[in-house]
């Protein structure tokens, strides 16, 4: 039992350490962590040709509160990085778009993150990287399942 407890503590510490490094080291110059997440979701959606996202959908994806999403979107909008567009089919729905002018700034910051990910992949090698990716997805599914059970 003590061995399992130590393993759990080590995993938690490793997770916290990675999270702190990602959030606390100011890797990005032009965006906060949450802003780059929002822009990343908007960019992926635009590139894939899927319909744009709403603020509610962004909140669902990021697990941020509606007030946090609105604060982030207002900031991005005031900097001219996004625009909001009311649906022609349902006036209650407002879509969020990444502006073309914001693309170079976003992609530049995205490249910085990819450089870090590339360093991880180079250090781990292809097989370990694939295994890490699979394990991260599996762990995310477990966390989502635990949270879903708590919400019931």
Regions found by a protein language model. Name each.
Residues 10-13, 37, 131-134, 138:
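Amphipathic alpha-helical interaction segments
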